């Protein structure tokens, strides 16, 4: 095992030296467990997979990856494709974020309308999880949602049902309740990880608009280490 991949670690160093770290890991005379991992992303996932591979190799797992096209996580899960069907994953990781929420509360919405949006959003994910479970019969790791990087309602954003913070907290609780009731379904808690890093830095609008990364690239080792654990 490499000490560079043990907590606490230097994210910038790992990103910069990922090729040499991988080479050192592969040079180790270690027998690893092969695993096929499908990464279904709501944003760009190339470098996430690159870092995820390092942490898995360091933990004694030899991964091969299927990577969905940009933003095609739901379509791949629901309808599959020739490549994914041939791949046959041992584990599915769904990388989504606040930016993948399709419908957010508006100030003019009634409580009933907001609850309908919540229910529709949750069912969008639930039907996908159930389809994956029925198709592949393997563990599923699902990101929850980071808090919004801006608050339209200020300090009331988490208390008023019109607030996006309130909405995200409810969604995260619904995800957690589902995980508690279903085996082989796990949450990768990016809500906590983004808070530790800092929401302003995590949201990184430049990286989103330039590369469609849902979070600052330098945060990659943090959520990926969470997923591998």
Spans of features found by a protein language model:
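Serine-esterase "nucleophile elbow" of acetyl-processing enzymes
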Residues: 2-68
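Conserved small/polar residues in nucleotide/adenosyl-binding loops
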Residues: 218-223
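Ala/Thr-enriched low-complexity intrinsically disordered regions
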Residues: 227-228
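Alpha-helical cap/lid subdomain in secreted, periplasmic
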Residues: 26-34, 51, 59-68, 74-217
């Amino acid at each position: 095992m490499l000490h560079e991949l043990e907590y606490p670690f230097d994210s910038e160093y790992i990103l910069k030296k990922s090729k040499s770290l991988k080479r050192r890991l592969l040079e180790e005379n270690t027998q690893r467990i092969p695993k096929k991992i499908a990464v279904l992303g709501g944003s760009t996932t190339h470098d996430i997979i690159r870092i995820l591979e390092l942490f898995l190799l360091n933990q004694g797992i030899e991964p091969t990856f299927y990577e969905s096209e940009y933003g095609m996580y739901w379509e791949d899960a629901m309808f599959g494709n020739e490549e994914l069907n041939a791949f046959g994953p041992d584990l599915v990781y769904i990388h989504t974020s606040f930016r993948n929420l399709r419908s957010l509360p508006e100030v003019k919405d009634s409580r009933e309308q907001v609850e309908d949006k919540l229910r529709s959003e949750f069912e969008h994910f639930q039907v996908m999880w159930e389809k994956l479970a029925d198709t592949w019969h393997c563990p599923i790791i699902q990101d929850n949602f980071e808090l919004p990087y801006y608050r339209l309602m200020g300090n009331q954003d988490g208390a008023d049902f019109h607030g996006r913070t309130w909405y995200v907290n409810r969604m995260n609780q619904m995800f957690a309740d589902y995980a508690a009731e279903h085996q082989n379904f796990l949450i990768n808690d990016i809500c906590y990880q983004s808070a530790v890093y800092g929401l302003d830095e995590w949201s990184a609008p430049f990286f989103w608009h330039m590369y469609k990364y849902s979070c600052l690239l330098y945060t990659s080792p943090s959520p990926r280490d969470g997923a591998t654990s």
